[in-house]
C-alpha cells in the first residue's frame, strides 16, 4: 500500500505478513542447515541470516557453489576441481567443467512409498505417485525410448500439460542423455512448430486432449499436423488424458487415430503412433535405469 509523505513523495507501507514459520520450522529448514554448513566451513562468514548469507553467495561464487554441490550430495562419476570457468562471460561461463552426472539420476535418488507427485486435473481427477512408482514408470518409458533408438544428444519433445506422465517422459528422456523440450497443448500450431521445428525431435509425447474452462479440448488433430510437419519424428506417443475426444463418439476414440504399432486400426490419422499406456505395459518388467552421465 502506498501513501505520500509531507513533501508529496511516495512512501510504501509494509503489509502485515500473511504467514510466518514457527521457530521449529525455521530450525528444520534446508536453508538453516545449509547456513550451518557454511558457518562451519567458513568461520569468518556471517551465515546467521539470509540477508547475511546472500552477499557472500554472489561475491565468493566458487566457494558458495562448492558448498551447494557438497551439501546436495550430487551423484556424479567424476567431480570437478574447478567450480566455474570464465565467470565474467554470460553466456559462456562453464560450471563444474570436469563433472559427469545425470539430472534424472539425482532427481530419482529417493525411494519409498511417500508421495513424489500429486497431479490434479481441472475436472477433479487426482492421482498421487510414490517415489517407488515414479522410478518404475520412468524405468519402463526409458526402456521403450532406448528400444526406439533414443541416444545421448537426441531430442524428445512433449506436447503435454503439467501432469505426471509429462514428468515421467522428461525423466526417462534425460536418463538416456537426451534433450527434453516441451510446450502446452493449448499452444497454437505455429507456436508449436516455432519451438519443435528448431530442435528436430526424434520422439514426441502428446496428450490426446486437455481440460480448460470446464471443457475437454481435443488435441489429436493438432498432433496429427505436428507429426506430418516435423520430418525428424520417428515415434509419436499418445497420452490419454481425456477419456475420448469431444464430438467424436463414433470415431472409436484415441486408438482410431493411430497407426504404426497399434494393431487393428488401419483407418487412422497419426503415423508411427503408440499409446503411452502400451509402452508402460510392454516394459513393465524393467526395474532398473542405466543412467547416462554426461559433462
Where are these regions (language model features)?
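N-terminal amphipathic, basic-rich helices that act as targeting or association modules
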Residues: 10-91
Amino acid at each position: 500500500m502506498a501513501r505520500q509523505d509531507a513533501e508529496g513523495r511516495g512512501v510504501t507501507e509494509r503489509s502485515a505478513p500473511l504467514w510466518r514459520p514457527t521457530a521449529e520450522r525455521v530450525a528444520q529448514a534446508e536453508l538453516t542447515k545449509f547456513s550451518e554448513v557454511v558457518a562451519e566451513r567458513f568461520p569468518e562468514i556471517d551465515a546467521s541470516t539470509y540477508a547475511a548469507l546472500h552477499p557472500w553467495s554472489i561475491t565468493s561464487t566458487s566457494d558458495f557453489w562448492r558448498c551447494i554441490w557438497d551439501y546436495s550430495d550430487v551423484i556424479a562419476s567424476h567431480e570437478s576441481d574447478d567450480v566455474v570457468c570464465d565467470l565474467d562471460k554470460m553466456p559462456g561461463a562453464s560450471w563444474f567443467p570436469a563433472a559427469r552426472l545425470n539430472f534424472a539420476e539425482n532427481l530419482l535418488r529417493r525411494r519409498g512409498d511417500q508421495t513424489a507427485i500429486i497431479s490434479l486435473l481441472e475436472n477433479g481427477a487426482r492421482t498421487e505417485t510414490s517415489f517407488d512408482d515414479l522410478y518404475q514408470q520412468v524405468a519402463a518409458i526409458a526402456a521403450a525410448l532406448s528400444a526406439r533408438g533414443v541416444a545421448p544428444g537426441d531430442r524428445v519433445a512433449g506436447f503435454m500439460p503439467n501432469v505426471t506422465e509429462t514428468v515421467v517422459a522428461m525423466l526417462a528422456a534425460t536418463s538416456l542423455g537426451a534433450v527434453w523440450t516441451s510446450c502446452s497443448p493449448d499452444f497454437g500450431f505455429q507456436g508449436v512448430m516455432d519451438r519443435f521445428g528448431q530442435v528436430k525431435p526424434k520422439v514426441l509425447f502428446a496428450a490426446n486432449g486437455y481440460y480448460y474452462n470446464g471443457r475437454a479440448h481435443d488435441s489429436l488433430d493438432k498432433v496429427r499436423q505436428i507429426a506430418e510437419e516435423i520430418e525428424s519424428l520417428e515415434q509419436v506417443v499418445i497420452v490419454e488424458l481425456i477419456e475420448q475426444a469431444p464430438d467424436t463418439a463414433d470415431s472409436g476414440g484415441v486408438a482410431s487415430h493411430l497407426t504404426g504399432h497399434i494393431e487393428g486400426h488401419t483407418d487412422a490419422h497419426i503415423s508411427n503412433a503408440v499409446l503411452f499406456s502400451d509402452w508402460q505395459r510392454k516394459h513393465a518388467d524393467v526395474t532398473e535405469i542405466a543412467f547416462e552421465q554426461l559433462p
